[in-house]
């Protein structure tokens, strides 16, 4: 049984070179949203006890009907 010649593989390195771009100094008015408010999301986005949306209200009502205590 003869073995076919395997092609030689060159040393493969990670291609981690990136193109360098010139630094641009943009005016602040061009780099920020013109909302007049520096908050991009609701301040209570992670509050679990807010419960004022329709889904939460319906879920609470359904849980009360079933007699399940909600946390």
Swiss-Prot record:
Residues 16-25 are annotated as: UBS-II. It holds the Pfam family DSS1_SEM1. This is 26S proteasome complex subunit rpn15. Versatile protein that might stabilize multiple protein complexes involved in diverse pathways. Subunit of the 26S proteasome which plays a role in ubiquitin-dependent proteolysis. Acts as a ubiquitin receptor of the 26S proteasome, by interacting with ubiquitin chains linked by 'Lys-63' and 'Lys-48'. Involved in nuclear export of specific sets of mRNAs. Links the mRNA adapter mlo3 to rae1 for targeting mRNA-protein complex to the proteins of the nucleoporin complex (NPC). Involved in recombinational repair of DNA. The gene is rpn15. Its main location: cytoplasm. It comes from Schizosaccharomyces pombe (strain 972 / ATCC 24843). The keyword Zinc-finger does not apply. One of its GO terms (molecular function) is molecular adaptor activity.
């Amino acid at each position: 049984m003869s073995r076919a010649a395997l092609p030689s593989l060159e040393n493969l390195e990670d291609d981690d070179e990136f193109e360098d771009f010139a630094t641009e100094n943009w005016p602040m008015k061009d780099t920020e949203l013109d909302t007049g408010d520096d908050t991009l999301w609701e301040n209570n986005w992670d509050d679990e006890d807010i419960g004022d949306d329709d889904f939460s209200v319906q879920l609470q009502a359904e849980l009360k009907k079933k007699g399940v205590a909600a946390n």
